[in-house]
């Protein structure tokens, strides 16, 4: 009988119809489990390309890795960028480590808009050393991880604070060399410093110099410039950013408000009907003494305002209209109410025409019709 799985959703990757499963959101701790399995699948022939692929799978392009611990000469804190992360993991194995994995206990997760933060106060980094003697090192501390909130769930920030470490030697090795004081003296010495090998510590010290030079190395690789030219270019661009004036806030362009044609036509009609009524009025306004090209009898219409290569805004246009024309307001359409009040269909005793005059000018306009009656 064939050993084909009975899962209806199973599709062999070697078959003609390979189906990739829909990506799903996994738990952050499971990503650490996948990273441990990937580190265990490492071989002695793993080159830089393998480590670059490892870092690309589990770390973001702008990821940072930070290690904090305390040595004999004081506390240390090293932060490296995404470019130097693959080399960090490779130096761990170059220092005699044969196996590396992380154990997270009682971790706390917090979800944000674009990231997931994992805070594990009881994290253990376990390394197996094959030389000079078989030793198991347990490095305990606090691990804070920030994952991206997407299907890839790659690490954006890695911060491991080392508190203590222990080096464990099997009893069988002690029993074998119980009669050899030189071997026992060698086994009593630590092979790591705060759980890190000398290879890793030297690399972290080197990263203090390499991390600021990432821009120079990237420019050298991109433009094929000499190191001196790369340094000059970077310094010049940094100087430009320092002396450049702050960017001015963008101003919104002024919009030009045009007159409504229907209001203008109704105003001209109403002014033509009221010519005889206002002929006997002795009122004289400043607007009547001005002359404009677009002028109708007894009504002053303001044209489009311009000013030496620029245009007035809405606020200026309203101000000019208010100064030059006291009988006509194009913005609010006050002439419609004047047409309604002066309609011949309304008598003097009509309840719709009982609005008292507001100013002395209105009384003077209504005086001639009352005299004619």
From Swiss-Prot:
Sorted UniProt keywords: Nucleus, Ubl conjugation
A GO biological process held by the record: regulation of kinase activity
Intracellular or extracellular location(s): Nucleus
GO cellular component: a single term: plasma membrane
UniProt note on tissues of expression: Expressed in multiple tissues including heart, brain, liver, kidney, testis, lung and muscle, with expression highest in the brain, trigeminal ganglia, and lung.
Function: Transcription cofactor. Binds to the LIM domain of a wide variety of LIM domain-containing transcription factors.
Family as reported in the entry's similarity comment: Belongs to the LDB family.
Name of the protein in its database record: LIM domain-binding protein 2
Gene name for this UniProt entry: Ldb2
């Amino acid at each position: 009988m064939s050993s084909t799985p009975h899962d209806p959703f199973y599709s062999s990757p070697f078959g003609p119809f390979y189906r990739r499963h829909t990506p799903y959101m996994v738990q952050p701790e499971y990503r650490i489990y996948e990273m441990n399995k990937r580190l265990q699948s490492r071989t002695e022939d793993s080159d830089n390309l393998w480590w670059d692929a490892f870092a690309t799978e589990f770390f973001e392009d702008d990821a940072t890795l930070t290690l904090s611990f305390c040595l004999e000469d004081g506390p240390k804190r090293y932060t490296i960028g995404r470019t130097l992360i693959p080399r960090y993991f490779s130096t761990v194995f170059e220092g005699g480590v044969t196996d590396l994995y992380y154990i997270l206990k009682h971790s706390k997760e917090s979800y944000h808009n674009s990231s997931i933060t994992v805070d594990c106060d009881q994290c253990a980094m376990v390394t197996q050393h094959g030389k000079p003697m078989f030793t198991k090192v347990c490095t305990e501390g606090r691990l804070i991880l920030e994952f991206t909130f997407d299907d890839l769930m790659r690490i954006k920030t890695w911060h491991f604070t080392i508190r203590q470490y222990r080096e464990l030697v099997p009893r069988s090795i002690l029993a074998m060399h119980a009669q050899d004081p030189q071997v026992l003296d060698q086994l009593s010495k630590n092979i790591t410093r705060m759980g890190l090998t000398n290879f890793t510590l030297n690399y972290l010290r080197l990263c203090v110099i390499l991390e600021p030079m990432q821009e120079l190395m990237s420019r050298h690789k991109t433009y094929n410039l000499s190191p001196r030219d790369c340094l000059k270019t970077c310094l010049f661009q940094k100087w430009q950013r320092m002396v450049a004036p702050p960017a001015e806030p963008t101003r919104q362009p002024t919009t030009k408000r045009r007159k409504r044609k229907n209001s203008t036509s109704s105003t001209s009609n109403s002014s033509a009907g009221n010519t005889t009524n206002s002929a006997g009025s002795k009122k004289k306004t400043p607007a009547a003494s001005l002359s404009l090209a677009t002028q109708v009898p007894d009504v002053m219409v303001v044209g489009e305002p311009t000013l030496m290569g620029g245009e007035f805004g809405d606020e200026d246009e309203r101000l000019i209209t208010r100064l030059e024309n006291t009988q006509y307001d194009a913005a609010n359409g006050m002439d419609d109410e004047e047409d309604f009040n002066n309609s011949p269909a309304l008598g003097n005793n009509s309840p719709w025409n009982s609005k008292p005059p507001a100013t002395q000018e209105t009384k003077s306009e209504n005086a001639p019709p009352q005299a004619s009656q």
